[in-house]
């Protein structure tokens, strides 16, 4: 069953980039709107944020259903999200800026939503690199701390999305609200866990 779920995840996550490749290869850029370059960037970024959001939602669902063995599926989703983020950044650098790195730095400094997006990208990159079993073992407890930053990367990604579209849309606000709820739930869970440990420690001393 776990193998079947993995296949479903990979097929679904491959869908967006496969569709985009088909559109570009077919030459039918009319499906990308009036500004294909902007649409490609937004499509890739939206796909990354969607997959990341699904990853955290499924994590909560698996926890509530008491199916911890399914949590390993989140790793594949996380790596796919990072893959789309890399494509999103590359599309911006290549298609929008023409590989002009000095302009990239200038844009990064002058545009707040790019700074927020860059921080989220950095967090996701570190998480992706640390998904290697060897590094996970070497990092010990720091691996857990690093991956807790994923919740903040999700929120930063949602803020980046809302800010970059410039106009308030239903999808951008929905993603922002869901991201805030997921982060708050994670922080509440950590608070309860630490409170429980503190209570146990005091009880042991008594």
UniProtKB/Swiss-Prot annotation:
Cellular-component GO terms for this entry? plasma membrane
Pfam families the record matches: Ferric_reduct (PF01794)
Which cofactors are reported in the record for this sequence? FMN; heme b
Record's subcellular location: Cell inner membrane
Under the subunit heading, UniProt states: Heterodimer of a catalytic subunit (MsrP) and a heme-binding subunit (MsrQ).
Q: Which family does it belong to?
A: Belongs to the MsrQ family.
Question: What is the recorded function of this protein according to its Swiss-Prot or TrEMBL entry?
Answer: Part of the MsrPQ system that repairs oxidized periplasmic proteins containing methionine sulfoxide residues (Met-O), using respiratory chain electrons. Thus protects these proteins from oxidative-stress damage caused by reactive species of oxygen and chlorine generated by the host defense mechanisms. MsrPQ is essential for the maintenance of envelope integrity under bleach stress, rescuing a wide series of structurally unrelated periplasmic proteins from methionine oxidation.
Question: Can you say what this protein is called?
Answer: Protein-methionine-sulfoxide reductase heme-binding subunit MsrQ
Organism in which the protein naturally occurs: Pasteurella multocida (strain Pm70)
């Amino acid at each position: 069953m776990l193998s079947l779920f993995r296949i479903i995840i990979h097929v679904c996550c491959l869908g967006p980039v496969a569709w985009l490749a088909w559109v570009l290869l077919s030459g039918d850029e009319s499906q990308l709107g009036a500004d294909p370059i902007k649409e490609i960037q937004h499509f890739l970024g939206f796909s990354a944020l969607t997959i990341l959001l699904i990853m955290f939602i499924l994590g909560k669902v698996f926890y509530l259903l008491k199916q911890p063995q399914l949590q390993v599926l989140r790793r594949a989703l996380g790596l796919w999200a990072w893959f789309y983020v890399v494509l999103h950044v590359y599309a911006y650098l290549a298609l929008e800026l023409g590989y002009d790195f000095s302009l990239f730095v200038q844009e990064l400094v002058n545009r707040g939503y790019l700074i927020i997006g860059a921080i989220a990208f950095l967090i996701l990159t570190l998480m992706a690199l640390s998904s290697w079993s060897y590094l996970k073992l070497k990092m010990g407890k720091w691996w857990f701390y690093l991956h807790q930053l994923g919740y903040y990367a999700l929120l930063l990604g949602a803020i980046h999305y809302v800010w970059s579209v410039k106009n308030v849309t239903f999808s951008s606000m929905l993603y922002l609200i869901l991201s805030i709820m997921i982060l708050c739930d994670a922080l509440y869970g950590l608070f309860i866990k630490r409170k429980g440990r503190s209570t146990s420690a005091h009880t042991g001393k008594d």
